[in-house]
Amino acid sequence: MSRVKRGVAAHAKHKKVLKAAKGFYGRRKNTIRAAKAAVDRSKQFAYRDRKVNKRNFRALWIQRINAAVRESGLTYGRFIDGLNKAGIEVDRKVLSDMAIHEPAAFGALVEASKKALSYLKDTGTKNEFETAVK
């Protein structure tokens, strides 16, 4: 029976792990045991943060839309409600982009949203709740 020497395979595995650990600080970049643990952990973070990234972008789009809509006297929630009642289906990413790059088109959507909301007064700028509070 011939003897199997696994040096080549082990070296290839170690090289793969150390390549993934490139740029890490301290022993994590050059000792195999520390590098393996660090790379495994970094993969877990990457997996988790791919999901978190989606949440963060949605929150950013909502903040941008809210800021743009408040200039017209609406809130984000009422604006979205008005769009739904008007039957306008535009996702938040596109709305955010329109608010930044195409303010005129976004303004048209705001006006369409205001018209669809029945609780706005004839002026179209303030709702009943805001006027009752003052």
Swiss-Prot record:
Entries under SUPFAM superfamilies matching the protein: Ribosomal protein L20
GO molecular function, one term: structural constituent of ribosome
Protein name, entry field: Large ribosomal subunit protein bL20
Xref: InterPro entries: Ribosomal_bL20 (IPR005813), RIBOSOMAL_L20_CS (IPR049946), Ribosomal_protein_bL20_C (IPR035566)
Coiled-coil annotated residue ranges, if any: none
HAMAP family: Ribosomal_bL20
Keyword annotations from UniProtKB, A to Z: Ribonucleoprotein, Ribosomal protein, RNA-binding, rRNA-binding
GO CC annotation: ribonucleoprotein complex; ribosome
Family: Belongs to the bacterial ribosomal protein bL20 family.
Function recorded in the entry: Binds directly to 23S ribosomal RNA and is necessary for the in vitro assembly process of the 50S ribosomal subunit. It is not involved in the protein synthesizing functions of that subunit.
Pfam families cross-referenced by the UniProt entry: Ribosomal_L20
GO biological process: one example: translation
Originating gene: rplT
